Amino acid sequence: MKVRPSVRRICEKCRVIRRHGRVMVICSSNPKHKQRQG
């Protein structure tokens, strides 16, 4: 999980979602693409 000031999709499979008021990126193809804004 990377924590970044601005998150964006890295590949086509990445999905931008909101959980508990936080913007996150989850990816089904590559778990290294997981990101959280903060």
From Swiss-Prot:
Keywords: Ribonucleoprotein, Ribosomal protein. One of its GO terms (biological process) is translation. One of its GO terms (cellular component) is ribosome. One of its GO terms (molecular function) is structural constituent of ribosome. The keyword Ribonucleoprotein applies. Belongs to the bacterial ribosomal protein bL36 family. This is Large ribosomal subunit protein bL36.
